[in-house]
């Protein structure tokens, strides 16, 4: 089997939505699609991935630059992230070699395309080899699994293939977000032990809530009792002072 071709459809380096370098795999719509994506670059992220259809969109953001790629879904996010990191390193290296002053000040006038073309070509070829190697490994694992299951049941290979396809499909449609933002949405299947754990957690929360409420009520009653006792003591003190001044109830007689 030859190399998997056209895994990288588009990649570019941009700053303030201005593209400083770009590679296009051939489809002219990639440029307009990339411009749209760059306008919507996710803020507060160092890197970000999203899979739509059969394409994966990757962002690497840092120092005011955005390194963006549109790749095939067969490529793993870890491989694409390494590709973007290499693109960043090579771009900065080429920029520094062509500039004598500040890197950020002179970046607009630097012609780095001639240096980046062979580098990006090499990076894409390396990425395609990684994808092809992963595909071959998955195919071998699938064949071995089907052979071992075939000796036990005629239906087992079919079930095994279906399970692997579902797992692969679910894995490829995962959207990478700061990381943890959508982790609670990825689990759609719960077993009995998970249900029991959830029930136990709810009971603990409910019990804790009741305990807090009871403690609050007790403190409130205690506070009311103290206020009433102080009020009664003040009233009795004032009444005693009044009796002492008026010598009993003589004031009322006059």
Swiss-Prot record:
<dbReference type="InterPro" id="IPR010908">
    <property type="entry name" value="Longin_dom"/>
</dbReference>
<comment type="similarity">
    <text>Belongs to the synaptobrevin family.</text>
</comment>
<dbReference type="GO" id="GO:0016020">
    <property type="term" value="C:membrane"/>
</dbReference>
<dbReference type="InterPro" id="IPR044783">
    <property type="entry name" value="PHYL"/>
</dbReference>
<keyword id="KW-0472">Membrane</keyword>
<keyword id="KW-0653">Protein transport</keyword>
<keyword id="KW-1133">Transmembrane helix</keyword>
<keyword id="KW-0812">Transmembrane</keyword>
<feature type="region of interest" description="Disordered">
    <location>
        <begin position="138"/>
        <end position="173"/>
    </location>
</feature>
<keyword id="KW-0813">Transport</keyword>
<feature type="compositionally biased region" description="Polar residues">
    <location>
        <begin position="145"/>
        <end position="155"/>
    </location>
</feature>
<dbReference type="InterPro" id="IPR011012">
    <property type="entry name" value="Longin-like_dom_sf"/>
</dbReference>
<protein>
    <recommendedName>
        <fullName>Phytolongin Phyl1.1</fullName>
    </recommendedName>
</protein>
<feature type="domain" description="Longin">
    <location>
        <begin position="12"/>
        <end position="113"/>
    </location>
</feature>
<feature type="transmembrane region" description="Helical; Anchor for type IV membrane protein">
    <location>
        <begin position="226"/>
        <end position="246"/>
    </location>
</feature>
<comment type="function">
    <text>Non-SNARE longin protein involved in membrane-trafficking machinery.</text>
</comment>
<dbReference type="GO" id="GO:0015031">
    <property type="term" value="P:protein transport"/>
</dbReference>
<keyword id="KW-0175">Coiled coil</keyword>
């Amino acid at each position: 089997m030859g190399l998997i071709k056209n895994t990288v459809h588009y990649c570019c380096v941009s700053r303030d939505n201005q593209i400083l370098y770009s590679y296009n795999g051939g489809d002219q719509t990639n440029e307009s699609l990339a411009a749209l994506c760059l306008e919507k670059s996710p803020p507060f992220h160092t890197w970000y991935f999203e899979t739509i259809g059969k394409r994966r969109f990757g962002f690497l953001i840092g120092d005011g630059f955005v390194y963006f790629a549109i790749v095939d879904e067969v490529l793993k996010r870890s491989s694409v992230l390494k590709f973007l990191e290499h693109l960043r390193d090579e771009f900065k290296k080429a920029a520094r070699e062509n500039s004598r002053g500040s890197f950020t000040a002179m970046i607009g006038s630097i012609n780095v395309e001639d240096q980046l073309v062979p580098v990006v070509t090499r990076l894409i070829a390396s990425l395609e080899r990684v994808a092809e190697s992963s595909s071959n490994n998955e195919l071998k694992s699938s064949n071995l699994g089907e052979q071992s299951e075939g000796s036990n049941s005629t239906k087992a290979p079919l079930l095994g293939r279906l399970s692997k396809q579902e797992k692969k499909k679910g894995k490829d449609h995962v959207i990478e977000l700061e990381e943890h933002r959508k982790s609670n949405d990825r689990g759609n299947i719960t077993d009995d032990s998970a249900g029991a754990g959830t029930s136990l957690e709810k009971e603990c929360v409910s019990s804790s809530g009741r305990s807090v409420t009871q403690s609050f009520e007790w403190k409130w009653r205690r506070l009311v009792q103290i206020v009433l006792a102080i009020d009664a003591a003040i009233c009795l003190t004032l009444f005693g002072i009044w009796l002492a001044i008026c010598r009993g109830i003589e004031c009322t007689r006059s």
